From Swiss-Prot:
Lineage, broadest ranks: Eukaryota, Viridiplantae, Streptophyta, Embryophyta, Tracheophyta
Any one GO BP annotation for this protein: protein ubiquitination
Domain F-box, residue spans: 13-65
Subunit structure: Interacts with DEK3.
Annotated disulfide bonds: none
Keyword check for Repeat: yes
Species this protein is from: Arabidopsis thaliana
Protein name: Putative F-box/kelch-repeat protein At1g20940
Length: 414
C-alpha cells in the first residue's frame, strides 16, 4: 500500500543524496557499464556525483575488460572479445567489417577506457559512453606517414620497405591519459628516433608541437619494432632491442634511458607489458614449452619472477603462435594449428591466480598472421572537445558510421 500523500512526488534525487557515500559507491560500482552510462544521462544527481575524478581510476576495477583484435598493417575487419579468465565454449566474439578500402583501421593505443584510432581520420573514443572526438593529425610527423606510407625519421630519410615498414613503426605513437587530473586530459606522444638521438612530438588535443626535450644515448640500440609502449606512473616507456627502455613523462616532458639489459634467446616470442597487480613493467619471453615472466626491479634489472608451462603445442601441426596480451592477471596467447579452418586461430588465456589455461575465443587469422591486441577496460572518462578547435565532419560521413560500429563492439551486458 502506498503511504505517500496523494499530492506528493517521488524524488529519487533526495533518496540518493541521503545514502551513505560508501553505500552509494558500492551500488554504482556494481552497475553494468551501460546502466551507469544511462543513469549519468538521465539523473542530474548521479551525473554530478560521477564527475568526481576518482570514478575514473576506480570504476574500471568492477567491469569486464575487452580485447580488441585487428590486423597490424591497416585492418578492414576489427574483432572484439570479452576478456575473461576461462570460457566453457569458443565463440567468434563481435566484429565489424570496414568495406571502404580507404578507411583501413589502425589502433594506436588504449588507456583508461579510451581508444586512440585512425579510420580515415584520427579519433579519440570512449566505447562505453559512445562519445568520440576527431583530431587533426596533419601536424604530426609520424601519423600521416604511418597510415599513408613514407615514414621519415628525424633525418628526413624514409624507411625502406614501403607501407609495411611504415606501419611497423606505429609503436612510436604513445597514448596517455592522466588519471589524477580533474580534467582527465589525454596526450599523444610520438617518439622520433634517429641513430642514438630521440625527440618527441606532443598533441594535447588541439595541436601538435615538438617538445624541447631530446635525449642522446651512449649505446646504439633501436626501438623494438611493433612493440607497443607501456604507460605506467604517468610515463610512457618504449622497449629497445637490448632490453633497455626509453621513458618520457608527457606532463613534465622529462626523458631518460633506463639501462636495463635483456638477452633475448633465439626463437623466443617477446611482449612488453605492465603488471597491474604490482604496478611494474614486465617482459614476457616465451618458447613453445615455457613462458617466462620478468619484472623490472629498481629500474635497471630484469628479474625472473615466474615460469609458466605453455599450452600443449606440437611443432608438427603448428603454423604459428605468439603472445597477445599480459596484464598481471591473465596471459593470452594466440595459436594457429594445421587442421583448423583456413582463417581460424584460437586465443588461449592463462589465469595467473588459478594457474590454469582456458580457451578464450576462436578468432579470424588472416594469411599474414600479424595481429595487434589492445585491452580496453570500460570507464566513464570524458572525451572533452574544444568547440573552437572542433574538426567538422558531416554526420553522414562513412568514417562516423565506422567509429560508431567499432565503439559498439564492446559487450556491456555481461
Amino acid at each position: 500500500m502506498n503511504n505517500l500523500p496523494r499530492n506528493s512526488q517521488f524524488d529519487s534525487s533526495s533518496i540518493i543524496n541521503d545514502l551513505p557515500l560508501d553505500l552509494l559507491d558500492e551500488i554504482l560500482f556494481r552497475l553494468e557499464p551501460k546502466s551507469m552510462a544511462m543513469m549519468r544521462c538521465t539523473n542530474n544527481s548521479i551525473k554530478s556525483y560521477l564527475s568526481d575524478p576518482r570514478f575514473g581510476p576506480e570504476y574500471p576495477s568492477w567491469v569486464r575488460p575487452s580485447l580488441f583484435n585487428l590486423g597490424s598493417y591497416g585492418a578492414t575487419y576489427v574483432c572484439c572479445h570479452p576478456l575473461v579468465s576461462s570460457c566453457d565454449y569458443m565463440s567468434p566474439g563481435n566484429g565489424v567489417e570496414l568495406f571502404d578500402g580507404s578507411a583501413d583501421c589502425y589502433i594506436f593505443g588504449s588507456c583508461s577506457g579510451l581508444l586512440l584510432l585512425y579510420i580515415g581520420c584520427l579519433f579519440v573514443a570512449n566505447p562505453l559512453t559512445k562519445r568520440f572526438r576527431i583530431l587533426d593529425h596533419s601536424g604530426s610527423k609520424l601519423i600521416p606517414m604511418i597510415v599513408n606510407g613514407g615514414l621519415k625519421g628525424l633525418s628526413g630519410i624514409s624507411y625502406p620497405g614501403g607501407n609495411v615498414a611504415c606501419t611497423e613503426r606505429a609503436m612510436c605513437v604513445g597514448f596517455a591519459v592522466n588519471r589524477n587530473l580533474t580534467t582527465k586530459r589525454f596526450k599523444i606522444v610520438g617518439i622520433l628516433e634517429m641513430e642514438n638521438v630521440y625527440g618527441f612530438e606532443i598533441n594535447e588535443g588541439d595541436s601538435w608541437r615538438l617538445s624541447e626535450t631530446s635525449i642522446t644515448t651512449s649505446s646504439k640500440s633501436d626501438l623494438t619494432t611493433r612493440m607497443k609502449p607501456v604507460y605506467l606512473d604517468n610515463t610512457l616507456h618504449w622497449l629497445r632491442n637490448d632490453g633497455s627502455i626509453m621513458s618520457f613523462n608527457p606532463e613534465t616532458e622529462q626523458a631518460c634511458l633506463i639501462p636495463s639489459i635483456f638477452h633475448r634467446e633465439p626463437d623466443t616470442k617477446l611482449l612488453f607489458a605492465e603488471s597491474v597487480k604490482i604496478n611494474r613493467l614486465t617482459l614476457i619471453s616465451g618458447t613453445i614449452e615455457t613462458i617466462s615472466v620478468y619484472t623490472l626491479v629498481e629500474n635497471h634489472k630484469w628479474t625472473l619472477t615466474r615460469r609458466i608451462k605453455n599450452i600443449s603445442i606440437e611443432e608438427e601441426t603448428l603454423v604459428y603462435w605468439n603472445i597477445a596480451m599480459y596484464d598481471g592477471k591473465c596471459l593470452v596467447v594466440r595459436v594457429k594449428k594445421m587442421g583448423l579452418e583456413p582463417l581460424a586461430s584460437v586465443l588461449h588465456v592463462y589465469d595467473m591466480e588459478a594457474n590454469s589455461w582456458g580457451v578464450l575465443v576462436s578468432t579470424l587469422a588472416w594469411p599474414n598472421c600479424v595481429r595487434d591486441f589492445y585491452k580496453l577496460t570500460p570507464s566513464l572518462f570524458f572525451v572533452e572537445e574544444d568547440e573552437q578547435q572542433k574538426v567538422l565532419v558531416a554526420s553522414n560521413d562513412r568514417r562516423i558510421s565506422y567509429i560508431n560500429s567499432i565503439m559498439g563492439l564492446i559487450d556491456t551486458t555481461k
